[in-house]
């Protein structure tokens, strides 16, 4: 769209990459070395710092900044004017200043056809794992350990893998939940 700026990668052999079927609305900026998946919607005035990864089908509200090295998971939804200074897990709804994990993005999952009867067990497991990670007394690392004690279907497995990477050394960590955990 109009007035979008995209910076190229900073070093030889690196890249700034934008996938297919994305919508970057007016006055968005992508910093160097950003990697965008497919089917992403970025509303007006989003400022993305360098080395940011945004997975497929994320929806990002307008007038916000995304800190460098942050990752935004697939099918996540970030509310407008949210301060995004930590990783946003897939399938989650984040909003606020500072940004906080609010809930699963159930509307986004439904819009992607992931609420069909044949996927009911997978959505139920995703909800249970999310509740274990964000609504129990466990810290994220302990919740991940407990979640991995059972066989995980693809959605819950992706959520856990994303969070395991997010809490690894040298990363910014996941967005905290409402209540500050």
Model-inferred region functions:
Residues 1-100:
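Structural signal for interior beta-strand "rungs" in well-ordered beta-sheet cores
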Residues 91, 97-181:
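Terminal amphipathic alpha-helical/low-complexity segments used for targeting or macromolecular assembly
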């Amino acid at each position: 769209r109009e007035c979008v700026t995209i910076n190229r990668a900073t070093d030889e052999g690196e890249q700034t990459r934008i996938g297919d079927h994305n919508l970057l609305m007016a006055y968005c900026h992508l910093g160097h070395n950003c990697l965008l998946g497919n089917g992403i919607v970025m509303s007006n005035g989003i400022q993305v710092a360098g080395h940011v990864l945004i997975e497929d089908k994320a929806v990002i509200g307008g007038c916000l900044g995304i800190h460098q090295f942050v990752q935004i998971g697939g099918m996540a939804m970030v509310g407008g004017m949210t301060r995004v200074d930590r990783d946003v897990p897939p399938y989650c709804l984040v909003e606020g200043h500072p940004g906080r994990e609010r809930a699963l993005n159930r509307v986004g999952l439904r819009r992607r056809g992931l609420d069909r009867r044949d996927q009911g067990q997978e959505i139920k497991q995703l909800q249970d794992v999310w509740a274990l990670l964000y609504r129990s007394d466990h810290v994220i690392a302990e919740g991940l350990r407990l979640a991995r004690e059972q066989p995980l279907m693809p959605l819950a497995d992706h959520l856990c893998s994303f969070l395991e990477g997010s809490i690894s050394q040298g990363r910014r960590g996941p967005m905290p939940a409402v209540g500050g955990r």
